[in-house]
Amino acid sequence: MVDSSPAVPASKSVGPTPTPGAFEVQKSKALPFDSFNPTGRPKVCNPLRLLWNLLAAPPVPFLITERSNARVRSLIESLSQDALILNVGAGGKVLAKNVLNLDIIPTGSTHALASVFALPFPDQAADLIILQGVLEHVPDPRRAVAEIVRVLKPGAVFYTEMPFLEPYHEAPIDVSRRTKFGLAMLCQPLTEIESGIHIGPASTLAWVMREFFAALVSGGHPIVYRRASSLVGWVLFPLRYFDYWLERYEHFHRIASSFYYIGRKDV
């Protein structure tokens, strides 16, 4: 989840208060399993219900390949264990033990609550900042990038991803899209190291076709839309596997689902 308001909320830590002046933030504990079953009664496994839930939730229509995951992993592993690495808008994702997860909504892996517009760190503090699927959800992405640049050390690296042809998806709002070159322009305060396709064109096709047919047959009825989306999703999701091959070809940037950008702050 990411910040959807230009207002700058005061940041606060989740869990024990961190040592003043230190950059470590104590990791919050995940909710115990019993908290999801407040009655305390044993749950009965219903095979038909499990099958229905499975059919109601097809695999996602997009493919994030190991090549994409390896880019982020290599950036993290290139730094020492005491480097300050921030994953802003992390949601529940854990990239590595030495990465601090920031978000405006707490999860079991959130280290601190903070807005992307007001990171709780001084100038030139971070060695690496990661934003995955965040910039499209904020009302002022240029302001967000400016805050990232403020917190980066000279010579430090910024990694981000942003959609181009992904269908609308709220988290909690969905604001903007960028071409490969538009994303580079957004990050112009930095010097580009590398950029390219993050999620390929086959995922674009699978996702757009799912949304099109679900919207077409639903007539605007939300329940019919959800069921149609699930049914069509099961039929179309295999298309995404073509991206293992297609994302290697740069000319597919014209119809890519999303792009990544890696930039360095000038010394």
PLM-predicted stretches and their roles:
Residues A70-H169, T179-F181, G263:
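Conserved SAM-binding loop
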